[in-house]
């Protein structure tokens, strides 16, 4: 399986993503600059955290216009796994690939610590290696991670089982404690916590690795077992 890590000006978690795939998952991965127009050779696309374009205007508001995002849109339509973490989640929302918005944290402070998440849906291509309602420890590092959507959108997210992760103790004011959501098709996941920072016990924990293992499992079952 071959992954692409999209690198925007200001990305700073791209190396962590690369490490998670190459060294922990053991799969092929490339850094791909934001001006690329073709992602056809890749099986999964990763949008890392950071401060793309300095977070000017709004987090992800400029990145959404990058050439690479047109290719990401195409990949999403093809059903390829798309994972956006932190700033990557913000970019997915700004691009319209996921509903809602990310606002300033309720306490108006940047937060960097490990939090507990509850796995709400383990039937997605990103969460199949977890147990439903499993509690996992994943780091956060954001100033604008307060997820917001209107009541109608929240109702749709809940009815469609699109809420992948919830905070056990809400750190930022996100509506309904939401930490991560998938699109209706189930192949695009956006989450504020950083699973790529929790893939090695030496770094404090490896409970985020199952996100990437789930992607790999789904791909193998689809393209290898059925080959």
Swiss-Prot record:
Ribonucleoprotein in keyword set: no
Active site: 86 (nucleophile), 194, 196
Pathway: Purine metabolism; IMP biosynthesis via de novo pathway; 5-amino-1-(5-phospho-D-ribosyl)imidazole from N(2)-formyl-N(1)-(5-phospho-D-ribosyl)glycinamide: step 1/2
Boundaries of every Glutamine amidotransferase type-1 domain copy: 3-225
Protein's UniProt keywords contain Nucleotide-binding: yes
Keyword terms: ATP-binding, Cytoplasm, Glutamine amidotransferase, Hydrolase, Ligase, Nucleotide-binding, Purine biosynthesis
This protein's GO CC annotations: cytoplasm
EC number(s) given by UniProt: 6.3.5.3, 3.5.1.2
GO MF entry, a single one: ATP binding
GO BP terms: 'de novo' IMP biosynthetic process
Swiss-Prot/TrEMBL catalytic activity: N(2)-formyl-N(1)-(5-phospho-beta-D-ribosyl)glycinamide + L-glutamine + ATP + H2O = 2-formamido-N(1)-(5-O-phospho-beta-D-ribosyl)acetamidine + L-glutamate + ADP + phosphate + H(+); L-glutamine + H2O = L-glutamate + NH4(+)
Stretches assigned to coiled coil: none
UniProt-annotated location(s): Cytoplasm
A Pfam entry, by short name: GATase_5
Function: Part of the phosphoribosylformylglycinamidine synthase complex involved in the purines biosynthetic pathway. Catalyzes the ATP-dependent conversion of formylglycinamide ribonucleotide (FGAR) and glutamine to yield formylglycinamidine ribonucleotide (FGAM) and glutamate. The FGAM synthase complex is composed of three subunits. PurQ produces an ammonia molecule by converting glutamine to glutamate. PurL transfers the ammonia molecule to FGAR to form FGAM in an ATP-dependent manner.
Subunit architecture: Part of the FGAM synthase complex composed of 1 PurL, 1 PurQ and 2 PurS subunits.
Protein name: Phosphoribosylformylglycinamidine synthase subunit PurQ
Species whose genome carries this gene: Bacillus cereus (strain G9842)
